[in-house]
């Protein structure tokens, strides 16, 4: 058992770590010990009552693909979908002709207005689980990075219902990435869930390929444009449709595969946070 010293942050294990042949073993994840003790029986849950949201962003690419470590390019749009209602909300910086009853388009006067409008919506609708394709390594860090860059750390921390957001740099396959832990929200990247629970190797884990393999559907093609910059510059209407379809594809993957539902069931069974199922 790992005991904590009175009046000190140092635990017994730390105190004796320099002593030769004196190993102290124990489990110091006290939260899970508390949960196990207080809830010894099986915990019932209603998946339908969970607030689950899918998110996808689009960013300018004036200087190549946006670098998440720098967050130097302006954001163009943010699209979110509520899994319970299936309603889609789009925050965009240019006019868009909306023809769908399930889509609400919020026209914003530039990026700062877009981020403030999104943050207002976010604070009123904090999700229990946030998902999307590569959302943990791209969408979330880019939103947090731009909020901090434009408005400061205090406003960025409003992404957490507890106003606690920690960031760290991690290395994946030799490449540096930044992740943000928004306390109170479980970010369940659907790409990671797919890799974890499908037990198959794919030639590509791009959303376009996986959606075609699993659903027979693809992302909206924009090959008629010379590059991505030409796409959002010259065809904003289709560009927003492209953003919406990316969110819908992730929802359709969940409808078929129910990987989020599986992760939640495992988490309740093991009495851990949903993100911890990655490590089982």
Place the predicted regions along the sequence by residue:
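Short, flexible loop/turn elements at secondary-structure junctions
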Residues: 57-61, 82-84, 136, 189-194, ...
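Common nucleic-acid-contacting/processivity interface regions adjacent to the catalytic cores
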Residues: 229-280
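Beta-sheet entry/capping signal
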Residues: 50-52, 120, 128-131, 136-137, ...
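Conserved RNase H-like, two-metal-ion catalytic cores of nucleic-acid enzymes
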Residues: 31-129
């Amino acid at each position: 058992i790992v005991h904590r010293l009175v009046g000190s942050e140092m635990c017994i294990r730390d105190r004796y770590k320099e002593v030769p042949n004196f190993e102290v073993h124990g489990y110091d994840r006290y939260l899970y010990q508390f949960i196990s003790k207080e809830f010894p029986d099986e915990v019932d849950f209603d998946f339908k009552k969970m607030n689950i949201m899918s998110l996808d962003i689009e960013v300018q690419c004036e200087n190549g693909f946006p670098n998440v470590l720098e967050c130097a390019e302006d954001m163009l749009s943010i699209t979110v979908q509520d899994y319970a209602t299936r309603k889609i909300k789009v925050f965009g910086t240019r006019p868009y002709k909306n023809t769908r009853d399930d889509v609400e388009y919020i026209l914003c006067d530039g990026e700062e207005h877009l981020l403030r409008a999104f943050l207002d919506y976010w604070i009123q609708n904090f999700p229990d689980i946030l998902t999307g394709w590569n959302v943990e390594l791209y969408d979330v860090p880019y939103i947090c990075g731009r909020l901090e860059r434009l408005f400061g750390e205090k406003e960025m921390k409003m992404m957490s219902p507890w106003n606690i957001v920690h960031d760290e740099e991690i290395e994946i396959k030799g490449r540096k990435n930044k992740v943000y832990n928004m306390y109170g929200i479980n970010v369940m990247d659907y790409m990671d869930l797919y890799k974890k629970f499908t037990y198959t190797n794919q030639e590509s884990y791009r959303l376009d390929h996986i959606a075609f393999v699993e659903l027979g559907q693809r992302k909206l093609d924009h090959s008629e444009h010379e590059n991505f910059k030409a796409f959002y510059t010259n065809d904003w209407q289709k560009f927003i449709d492209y953003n919406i379809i990316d969110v819908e594809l992730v929802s359709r993957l969940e409808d078929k595969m129910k990987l989020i539902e599986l992760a939640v069931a495992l988490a309740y069974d093991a009495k851990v946070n949903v993100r911890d199922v990655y490590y089982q």
